[in-house]
A protein has these predicted regions:
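Flexible, active-site-adjacent loop/turn segments at secondary-structure boundaries
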Residues: 11-13, 18, 27, 31, ...
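His/Asp/Glu-enriched, well-ordered alpha-helical/loop segment
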Residues: 26, 47-48, 53-54, 59-126
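Low-complexity, flexible helical/coil segments
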Residues: 16-24, 38-47, 88-94, 153-165
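A generic local structural motif
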Residues: 38-42, 111-112, 146
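Electropositive phosphate-/nucleotide-binding environments in soluble metabolic enzymes
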Residues: 23, 32-40, 74-81, 94, ...
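Active-site core of metal-dependent hydrolases
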Residues: 1-54, 58-74
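C-terminal cap of metal-dependent C-N hydrolases
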Residues: 72, 120-169
Length: 169
């Protein structure tokens, strides 16, 4: 049979159209945000295994193209830095990890990662129960257009080790 995979962005899992100020261009994304029942269906699809992967849909837009009248502003929001906390706020940790790491590797035919003696491990240190507020001051991306600015997220990242170096602390 034909191999098919399905993904959804973190902001489509967590943001609901009628709860937001739609004249705020930070939430202008493509496809547009939908209803609470749509979001519930997406979450069910993840839990049931119909949806395989959650993406950041990281689409940085410079301030000149976001600080326009809503209809003229470009679509897009950054999503990489808020991804874990956003998703972990609405899903259990097992589903979160599977959709962010295990399933994407499987889809692309990559082996599962294991931690073994005498091998280099790339790790993210996090507390799945930790709470943090996603603030504009802490955004590392050049673009600051996040739909999650000021929101409380569940899951605090303390650091990332890659190729024997601490790359985020």
């Amino acid at each position: 049979g034909l191999k098919v995979s399905c993904s959804v962005s973190a902001h489509h899992l967590t943001l609901i159209d009628d709860e937001l100020d739609f004249f705020d261009s930070k939430v202008k994304v493509t496809p547009p945000l939908r209803t609470k029942s749509d979001t519930k269906a997406l979450l069910k699809g993840l839990k049931d295994g119909v949806i395989d992967v959650i993406t950041s849909d990281h689409n940085p837009i410079d301030i000149e193209h976001k600080k326009l009248e809503f209809s003229l502003a470009k679509d897009g929001t950054i999503g990489l830095e808020s991804l874990f906390g956003t998703v972990n706020s609405v899903l259990d940790i097992e589903t979160t990890i599977k959709a962010l790491t295990i399933n994407p590797r499987a889809i692309f035919g990559q082996e599962s990662i294991t931690i073994e003696k005498d091998t280099v491990a790339n790790l993210t240190l996090f507390n799945p129960e930790g709470i943090s507020v996603f603030s504009k001051e802490n955004i590392l991306s050049t673009s600051k257009n996040s739909a999650f600015t000021g929101k409380e997220l569940k899951g605090k990242v303390y650091g990332i080790f890659a190729n024997k170096k601490l790359v985020l602390n």
